[in-house]
From Swiss-Prot:
Keywords: Ribonucleoprotein, Ribosomal protein
Domain of life the protein comes from: Bacteria
Protein's gene: rpmI
CC annotations in GO: cytosolic large ribosomal subunit
NCBIfam families noted in UniProt: rpmI_bact
Keyword Ribonucleoprotein tagged: yes
The organism of origin for this protein: Polynucleobacter necessarius subsp. necessarius (strain STIR1)
Region: Disordered, residue numbers: 1-21
Coiled coil: none
Name of this chain's protein: Large ribosomal subunit protein bL35
């Protein structure tokens, strides 16, 4: 059986941690930042975890992760 393909967009957006949780980047921090407060932008720094409801669908997009 041939190898399964991973979704390219999912490869760029998600990474699987050692414990099995999936890491994602924060949204709303690319542009239109002038109207956002410094506190708001500070809270958008770093990464976040994917919700439990979405883990199954993301794992199917990344078969070898």
């Amino acid at each position: 059986m041939p190898k399964m393909k991973s979704k390219s967009s999912a490869k760029m957006r998600f990474s699987v941690r050692a414990g099995g949780t999936i890491k994602r980047g924060q949204a709303f921090k690319r542009h239109i930042l002038t109207k956002k407060t410094t506190k708001n932008k500070r809270h958008l720094r770093g990464s976040a975890e994917v919700a439990k409801a979405d883990i199954k669908s993301i794992r199917s997009m990344l078969p070898y992760a």
